[in-house]
Amino acid sequence: MKFSLKDLFGLVVSFGLIFLALTIGSGIQHWTGTSVPGSVIGMLVLFVSMAIGLVKVEWVKPGASLLIRYMILLFVPISVGLMEHFDMLIANALPIIASAIGGSLIVLVSLGWLLQRILGKEA
């Protein structure tokens, strides 16, 4: 697989923009002291900057495509961490399952109620 200098530059710019958004998000998280992770805030920063046209999608696409292509490798450290702390996971299995089911039910009921309000009660 051959890479041209233009492709390499596109990857550098793309990763630079992604990491800049991550850094800004981490800074906002640290500055505000919120419990929302900096990576999530950074993703929102990147989304908003693309939505308002500050950053073009074509600038971010090469790096994002590469990350998505090899995403499975990014789950290896998480899997190893889960195996290392499996006893803690089992000890907290009931709260984890309850919060997953409860959260899903809350989202389902809220979304159903909201859609009925927006679309009108046609059923």
UniProtKB/Swiss-Prot annotation:
A Gene Ontology cellular-component term: plasma membrane
Localization (cell): Cell inner membrane
Membrane-related topology note: Multi-pass membrane protein
HAMAP family: UPF0299
Pfam family, one: LrgA
Broad class of where this protein is predominantly found: membrane
Keywords: Cell inner membrane, Cell membrane, Membrane, Transmembrane, Transmembrane helix
Protein name: UPF0299 membrane protein VV1471
